[in-house]
């Protein structure tokens, strides 16, 4: 495969932010909703989506007495401090470095997060970003017409790297993001899913002659030989 670039999702792929989002959303639900706890039945439709979709799903599911925009603003207030200490997922600190310096790939990030939230959650890893990441595309970029599961963000990230998606490997954890990566035309998609979504990902229908889908338990299992 003629792979020249690697594109990484952020939440749940590079950084372990999903529990932070859950806690912040739960605080808003407790304050303005019906007191229910977030369940996987709802959360599975939220993982990997844009913040706008994410918030609308929660508002509708838990009868929140706020608009989606108000929910987002309140939730984001609860995210600021925890983001400052969020950790890398297993193998996620090393893999982009390896892609850039050992495999000689251009490396990008494509995240559904807004620029504001991206900067908050990466404030403590600025040097790592500078060293390992060539381009970053956030979910509120005006050039993105549709969020995941539409492929727009990955197509744009590849373009920012000066590449076509078919020359990229894309790393994702969420079903919506994996579908977006496949739809972009990427030659290879590396999925590191929540175990609860693994079955759904294994059952994705796609053109196996166009895209190779690799499913791993954690990113430290990745090696370029898996693509070839």
Spans of features found by a protein language model:
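Asp-based, Mg2+/Mn2+-dependent phosphohydrolase catalytic module
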Residues: 1-4, 114-228
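N-terminal helical cap/lid subdomain that shapes the substrate entry/recognition surface
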Residues: 2-103, 119
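Conserved phosphate-coupling serine/threonine residues in phosphotransfer and NTP-handling enzymes
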Residues: 13, 111-113
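Non-catalytic, surface-exposed connector residues within folded enzymatic/regulatory domains
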Residues: 37, 69, 86, 112, ...
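Proline-centered flexible-loop/turn and helix-kink motifs
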Residues: 103-104, 127
């Amino acid at each position: 495969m003629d792979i020249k670039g690697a594109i990484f999702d952020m939440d749940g792929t590079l950084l372990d932010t999903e529990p932070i989002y859950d806690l912040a959303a739960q605080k808003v639900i407790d304050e303005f909703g019906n007191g229910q706890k977030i369940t996987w039945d709802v959360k599975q439709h939220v993982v990997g989506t844009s913040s706008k979709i994410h918030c609308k799903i929660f508002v509708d599911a838990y009868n929140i007495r706020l608009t989606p925009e108000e929910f987002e603003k309140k939730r984001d207030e609860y995210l600021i401090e925890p983001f400052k200490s969020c950790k890398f997922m297993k193998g996620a600190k090393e893999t982009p470095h390896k892609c850039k310096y050992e495999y000689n790939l251009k490396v990008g990030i494509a995240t559904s997060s807004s620029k504001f939230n991206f900067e908050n959650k990466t404030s403590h890893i600025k040097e790592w970003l500078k060293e390992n990441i060539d381009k970053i595309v956030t979910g509120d970029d005006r050039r993105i017409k549709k969020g995941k599961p539409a492929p727009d963000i990955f197509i744009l990230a590849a373009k920012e790297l000066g590449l076509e998606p078919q020359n990229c490997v894309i790393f994702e954890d969420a079903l919506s993001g994996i579908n977006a990566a496949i739809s972009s035309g990427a030659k290879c998609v590396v999925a590191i899913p929540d175990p609860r979504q693994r079955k759904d990902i294994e059952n994705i229908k796609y053109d196996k002659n166009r895209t190779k889908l690799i499913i791993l338990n954690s990113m430290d299992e990745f090696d370029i030989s898996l693509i070839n």
